[in-house]
Curated annotation (Swiss-Prot):
GO terms for biological process: siderophore-dependent iron import into cell. Signal peptide: none annotated. One of its GO terms (molecular function) is transmembrane transporter activity. Belongs to the binding-protein-dependent transport system permease family. FecCD subfamily. It comes from Yersinia pestis. InterPro entries: ABC_BtuC-like, ABC_transptr_permease_BtuC. It holds the Pfam family FecCD. The lineage of its organism: Bacteria, Pseudomonadati, Pseudomonadota, Gammaproteobacteria, Enterobacterales. This is Hemin transport system permease protein HmuU. It is a multi-pass membrane protein. Part of the binding-protein-dependent transport system for hemin; probably responsible for the translocation of the substrate across the membrane. Keywords: Cell inner membrane, Cell membrane, Ion transport, Iron, Iron transport, Membrane, Transmembrane, Transmembrane helix, Transport.
Length: 334
């Protein structure tokens, strides 16, 4: 098929691109840092502190969160057998955001590390609850895409209204924290944040990669997958749980960053095909590259100020989503 490339070549290209982007991103920002400057500077200098304790954790967190969002999106699209099944569009990210918002506006404060864990638990509970609702509605509607998207829109609206109530009752400090977090930002990246997020996201991504065969068989339909030896109910519940963990961990540390789970899997699928043995690792690398690029632009476009990275991904993903809908409509009419 035109435009297709060998999966191994694509994965190799994405890996090299990710390394280049990571090295470039670590040196870019309000203060430009080159490796030559760092080499000629004492390790006690402020430049080393900026690079080691601010830039590097943020770059690595962008890679980890990008992997989580893209792998989660790939799993959801495979689970629902539709390329429009994105965690953000279906309201899963909104559910996670609502639970974290409830924790932010609690009348008592928590120690930083305990607060991070509570955010992750809340985001996981919210994403799992909405995922279960969406999955149930999908079964009731026999997989009808229109009903699924309408359900996602309704859930997004309900969660958005609840978030609005939380915003209204929050004080100034809570409002500032919640507003920045709800637009998506990696500005709070620290080594402790990276360690906690990585300890959840990386093992879950590996477990997701191990589900590639089940995802491939589920594309044939539930009955066919069952005849080929797949316990369909357990496989779907397992995939739903993995996706909820990934979304919960990502939302807890970075806020709501949309459209990566929609755009990246579709782009990778167009290049290497729908075999999840290659699609899942390709999406992980592609998601890391895209979020790292968006975060670098967020730090540099209006330096020394900073844009929420979620705004940039939405500016990219919104038009792409409209194009995808029009493209599917043309394919049906053709």
């Amino acid at each position: 098929m035109n435009g297709r490339v060998q999966p191994r070549l694509m994965l190799g290209f994405l890996l090299i691109l990710l390394v280049i982007l990571a090295l470039g991103s670590a040196n870019m920002g309000a203060l430009s840092l080159s490796f030559r400057t760092l080499w000629n500077t004492s390790t006690n200098d402020a430049m080393w502190h900026i690079w080691l304790n601010i830039r590097l954790p943020r770059v690595l967190l962008a890679v980890v969160v990008g992997c989580a969002l893209a792998v989660s999106g790939t799993i959801m699209q495979g689970l629902f057998r539709n390329p429009l099944a994105d965690p953000g569009l279906l309201g899963i990210s909104s559910g996670a955001a609502l639970c974290v918002g409830l924790i932010i506006v609690m009348p008592f404060s928590l120690p930083p590390l305990l607060a991070l864990y509570s955010h992750m638990v809340g985001a996981f509970i919210g994403s799992l609850a909405i995922s279960t609702i969406i999955f149930t509605l999908s079964r009731w509607g026999h997989g009808n895409l229109a009903r699924l998207l309408l359900a996602g829109i309704a859930i997004n609206a309900l969660c958005g209204a609840a978030v609005g109530v939380l915003t209204y009752i929050s004080d100034d400090q809570q409002l500032r924290q919640f507003s920045l977090w709800s637009m998506g930002s990696l500005g709070q990246a620290q080594w402790s944040t990276l360690l906690v997020a990585s300890s959840l996201i990386l093992p879950t991504c590996i477990l997701g990669l191990l589900q590639a065969r089940q995802l491939n068989l589920l594309q044939l339909g539930d009955e066919e997958a069952h005849y080929l030896g797949v316990n369909v109910r357990q496989a779907k519940l397992r995939l739903l749980l993995l996706s909820a963990i990934l979304i919960g961990a990502a939302v807890a540390v970075s806020g709501v960053i949309g459209f990566i789970g929609l755009v990246v899997p579709h782009l990778i699928r167009m290049r290497i095909g729908a075999d999840h043995r290659w699609l899942l690792p390709g999406a992980a690398l592609g998601g890391a590259c895209l979020l790292l690029t968006a975060d670098t632009l967020a730090r540099t476009l209006v330096a020394p100020a900073e844009m929420p990275v979620g705004l940039l991904t939405s500016l990219l993903g919104g038009p792409y989503f409209l194009w995808l809908i029009l493209r599917q409509r043309e394919q049906r009419s053709g």
